[in-house]
UniProtKB/Swiss-Prot annotation:
Record organism: Schizosaccharomyces pombe (strain 972 / ATCC 24843)
Gene name of the record: rps2401
PANTHER family, per the entry: 40S RIBOSOMAL PROTEIN S24 (PTHR10496)
Described purpose of this protein according to its UniProt entry: Component of the ribosome, a large ribonucleoprotein complex responsible for the synthesis of proteins in the cell. The small ribosomal subunit (SSU) binds messenger RNAs (mRNAs) and translates the encoded message by selecting cognate aminoacyl-transfer RNA (tRNA) molecules. The large subunit (LSU) contains the ribosomal catalytic site termed the peptidyl transferase center (PTC), which catalyzes the formation of peptide bonds, thereby polymerizing the amino acids delivered by tRNAs into a polypeptide chain.
Top-level taxonomy: Eukaryota, Fungi, Dikarya, Ascomycota, Taphrinomycotina
Gene Ontology cellular component terms for the protein in this record: cytosol; cytosolic small ribosomal subunit
Bias type Basic residues, positions: 105-117, 124-134
Similarity field: Belongs to the eukaryotic ribosomal protein eS24 family.
Name this polypeptide is given: Small ribosomal subunit protein eS24A
Other information: There are 2 genes for eS24 in S.pombe.
Length: 134
């Protein structure tokens, strides 16, 4: 993280109901690449004297021409409040939760279609009806 990076916050609001502080973050980084989210979380944690693991930064967009990035930041009172209120995918991004393991799409479809097939006594009756119609 370079010292030439300036972080400003605006539209600061304390949200007691969700146990957090929320704000819009402006990052000035002229002539430099974008700041990483982890560096931003650490810097915001230092600015607001909180643990960096309770800080969430998202929605960062770099303005045309570079040098200026704007996004949102949420600073929770503690990590437990963060786990309670943050969406699961954001918790996965910062390492507070494990990603959901999904079954492959094709396997889900095959299972659905196998379940639709007639089996057992019903299968025998269906076979007899088809023979009677022939």
């Amino acid at each position: 993280m370079s010292e030439a990076v300036t972080i400003r916050t605006r539209k600061f609001m304390t949200n007691r109901l969700l146990q957090r502080k929320q704000m819009v973050v402006d990052i000035l980084h002229p002539g430099k690449a974008n700041i990483s989210k982890n560096d931003l979380r650490e810097k915001l944690g230092q600015m607001y004297k909180t643990d960096a693991s309770a800080v969430q930064a998202f929605g960062l967009r770099t303005h045309y021409g570079g040098g200026r990035t704007t996004g949102f930041a949420l600073i929770y009172d503690d990590v437990e409040a963060m786990k309670k209120f943050e969406p699961h995918y954001r918790l996965v991004r910062v390492g507070h939760a494990e990603p959901i393991q999904k079954v492959a799409r094709q396997q889900r479809k095959q299972r659905k279609n196998r379940g639709k097939k007639v089996f057992g006594t019903g299968k025998r009756l269906a076979k007899r009806k088809s023979k009677q119609q022939d």
